[in-house]
Regions:
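Structural motif
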Residues: 97-99
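N-terminal short beta-loop-beta anion/metal-coordinating cradle
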Residues: 2-88, 92-93
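Mid-sequence, gly/pro-rich, charge-dense loop/helix-turn segments that line enzyme active sites
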Residues: 108-158
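Short, active-site-adjacent cap segments at secondary-structure transitions
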Residues: 27-29, 105-108
Length: 158
């Protein structure tokens, strides 16, 4: 299946605030330390997500993590905690750019390390198993990623 959106008109706008969404604290820790980000007050008393923020050069950088599961004490992972954390952070911070970062299941066996960056050309869902006839392929899916030639160019020249 091809991407639903092939092109979007992008207006030139200075990016003053970047929000990075990262599910797990261990994934976020190197970025938090490198940028010396400080924890902000809770987004919502009932939401476990945590926001960190600070300045890098002349840009505000915020990181939101999904927080811990109150029952099991592990990092909240998956689409529901990610959606909630992202929504609440966007609502509170109004960022210019949102980056979803993480390992999406991890690639340590393939040599990936925390901090490595990858630009995908395709994506699939590995947490949407739907055992209903006709929904299996939809649930796992295999979709083209939105084309990002400028991001790829920047990452190759960095």
């Amino acid at each position: 299946m091809s991407a639903i959106v092939s092109e979007v008109a992008v207006t030139e706008k200075r990016i003053n605030h970047v929000l990075v969404v990262i599910a797990m604290e261990a994934e976020a820790a190197p970025l938090l330390m490198r940028l010396n980000l400080s924890i902000l007050p809770s987004i919502s008393p009932s939401a476990p997500c945590i926001i960190y923020s600070g300045l890098y050069k002349d840009c505000t950088v915020s990181v939101v993590t999904n927080g811990k599961c109150g029952k099991h004490g592990v990092d909240n992972v998956g689409t529901v905690p990610a959606s909630l954390s992202t929504f609440l952070a966007v609502h509170q911070l109004n960022p210019d750019l949102i980056i979803n970062a993480g390992t999406a299941g991890g690639f340590q066996k393939k040599g990936a390390m925390i901090g490595d960056s990858y630009i995908c050309s395709h994506m699939a869902n590995h947490d949407r198993r739907i055992p209903i006839p006709g929904f299996t392929d939809y649930g796992t899916g295999c979709y083209d990623a939105y084309p990002t030639p400028n991001i790829i160019l920047v990452s190759m020249t960095y």
